[in-house]
Amino acid sequence: MDSKHVTESTSGQEDIQKTWWKEAIIYQIYPRSFQDSDGDGIGDLNGITSRLDYIQSLGVDIIWLNPIFLSPNDDNGYDISDYREIMREFGTMEDFDRLLKEIHKREMRLVLDLVVNHTSDEHPWFEEARKSRHNPYYNYYHWWPAEKGEPPLRLSYFDEEG
């Protein structure tokens, strides 16, 4: 099956473009362990930016970043508490903007690991939802009823106690 498609350019000539999401070389980065730029032992956005030439030299088309959003880090960054903030140890929104600009300068793309199927228990939606069954955020979550007189069952693949 041919994974290329043809588009017509503004000049009227046909352009053949790669179907980027099918044919691209994707380089996944777990920011925490990739490259530390400030000596604190934690990888960060500026560290990733500093290695873009190397990544590009590998023939990479897309960089896929694991979660970088604000998180209490109980679930390796997948427990996001604010989708509008960068995890402080990774840098700032300005660092992210610079990283994105530098990626685009090298004609690469960026894919973010956007975790929308669950949040941190510290996320404002969850904090509101747990207040009442009538709260507007209550149905954002799936709630499991507790046995009478028992705490709710809490399942976690990462927590040995729960």
Tell what function each PLM region has.
Residues 2-162:
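Acidic/aromatic-lined carbohydrate-recognition and catalytic surfaces
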